[in-house]
From Swiss-Prot:
Membrane-related topology note: Peripheral membrane protein
Protein name as catalogued: Synaptotagmin-17
GO CC, alphabetical: exocytic vesicle; glutamatergic synapse; plasma membrane; postsynapse; trans-Golgi network
Natural source organism: Homo sapiens (Human)
Task of the protein: Plays a role in dendrite formation by melanocytes.
């Protein structure tokens, strides 16, 4: 088969068509040869294809055509170079040849022995999804840890440090005989009965026995005199609305036989705990807690009622409440008057063993650290829950109001000696506590309106420690 060298045309459209056909024919045969070489050769070859024509015919192209020629041919395609004709006398290429660029292709063919020669294979890497910056790390077996046991955590706590009463856990597991033998505080006899018709609970305090003898003031030896016991009754968690029996003089086996009624719905009563506290009123007018008895009312039949003998256990409350006082304050800016109403008191400490208390209230106005005025209520005989409903008025200009303090002191009237101190509070510039401060601020914010509030009485020492106004009065 003869290879015909065509002379490129230099004129117009025909010249472009000829060059395009020659390039297309050459590229088709080049691609076919490259494919055959990739399937048959095991070594790496470099094939260079030059174009466009006129150019020297590659050797492998001439070898593929030699199989169609006769064996008598003298020259091979590789020995007969094809040279293009030129019209210029100096043998240079025409302007159409120089305007065409020369293409060069270099292909490195790798060994494909393992592939089938009949069809080409495309080597595609598997697609991996994930964060590009993440690094693969081999999974290591985790270190076995000790099995967690919740009990190990709670063993670190000491429950008795968080208990309100350190003896409560021990007492629950003991009988009344064991409690009496362990603490030796005596026993208390009482009963309960709920009235569904009137919705009230009746608590009857009957008697006590085997109460311990009182301790002397310094605590070093026992006082040979007998105790002066009484009982306080309340329904926890409400300790404000408590009841109190009379004081029984010089006895370790007091008989009370007193009844007290609590107005409370039946369902609410079942959620309460009955607390009875036995207190000793000694000859130094001190109130010392002997012991207590607590009964959850959900564990008893309130409607049917019942009687109990219960052993007394130690109480964490060594000091009893001093009582409460209900006051009303009102300031009139136009008149410059500070009005005070002493309404009532409840559950005051007894100051006389035989007659109870004859309480009265002293009101003292202090401006800065100077006592200005003193007034007092009348005293009521033989009661610890007095009703006064008495009003007092003090002249306080508005510019001096912020420096004013009111000192309220409850005394037990004593005709034979000085009056017995029961409790005190301070309201105003030098208030004795948060409750008193709140009452004073409410009055300042609501002029011409009476503001009522209950206050728990404090000891003289506590008031003197926190309020300078308390130090200025007697």
């Amino acid at each position: 088969m003869a290879y015909i060298q065509l002379e490129p045309l230099n004129e117009g459209f025909l010249s472009r068509i000829s060059g395009l056909l020659l390039c297309r024919w050459t590229c088709r045969h080049c691609c076919q040869k490259c494919y055959e070489s990739s399937c048959c050769q095991s070594s790496e070859d470099e094939v260079e294809i030059l174009g466009p024509f006129p150019a020297q015919t590659p050797p492998w192209l001439m070898a593929s055509r030699s199989s169609d020629k006769d064996g008598d041919s003298v020259h091979t395609a590789s020995e007969v170079p094809l040279t293009p004709r030129t019209n210029s006398p100096d043998g240079r290429r025409s302007s159409s040849d120089t305007s065409k660029s020369t293409y060069s292709l270099t292909r490195r063919i790798s060994s494909l022995e393992s592939r089938r020669p009949s069809s080409p294979l495309i080597d595609i890497k598997p697609i991996e999804f994930g964060v590009l910056s993440a690094k693969k790390e081999p999974i290591q077996p985790s270190v076995l840890r000790r099995t967690y046991n919740p009990d190990d955590y709670f063993r670190k706590f000491e429950p008795h440090l968080y208990s309100l009463d350190s003896n409560s856990d021990d007492v629950d597991s003991l009988t009344d005989e064991e409690i009496l033998s362990k603490y030796q505080l005596g026993m208390l006899h009482f009963s309960t009965q709920y009235d569904l018709l009137h919705n009230h609970l009746t608590v009857r305090v009957i008697e006590a026995r085997d109460l311990p003898p009182p301790i002397s003031h310094d605590g070093s030896r026992q006082d040979m005199a007998h105790s002066n016991p009484y009982v306080k009754i309340c329904l926890l968690p409400d300790q404000k609305n408590s009841k109190q029996t009379g004081v029984k003089r010089k006895t370790q086996k007091p008989v009370f036989e007193e009844r007290y009624t609590f107005e409370i719905p039946f369902l609410e009563a079942q959620r309460r705990t009955l607390l009875l506290t036995v207190v000793d009123f000694d000859k130094f007018s001190r109130h010392c807690v002997i012991g207590k008895v607590s009964v959850p009312l959900c564990e008893v039949d309130l409607v049917k009622g019942g009687h109990w003998w219960k052993a007394l256990i130690p109480s964490s409350q060594n000091e009893v409440e001093l009582g409460e006082l209900l006051l009303s304050l009102n300031y009139l800016p136009s008149a410059g008057r500070l009005n005070v109403d002493v309404i009532r008191a409840k559950q005051l400490l007894q100051t006389d063993v035989s007659q109870g208390s004859d309480p009265f209230v002293k009101i003292q106005l202090v401006h800065g650290l100077k006592l200005v005025k003193t007034k007092k209520t009348s005293f009521l005989r033989g009661t610890i829950d007095p009703f006064y409903n008495e009003s007092f008025s003090f002249k306080v200009p508005q510019e001096e109001l912020e420096n004013a303090s009111l000192v309220f002191t409850v005394f037990g009237h004593n005709m034979k000696s000085s009056n017995d101190f029961i409790g005190r509070i301070v309201i105003g510039q030098y208030s004795s506590g948060p409750s008193e401060t709140n009452h004073w601020r409410r009055m300042l914010n609501t002029h011409r309106t009476a503001v009522e509030q209950w206050h728990s009485l404090r000891s003289r020492a506590e008031c003197d420690r926190v309020s300078p106004a308390s130090l200025e009065v007697t």
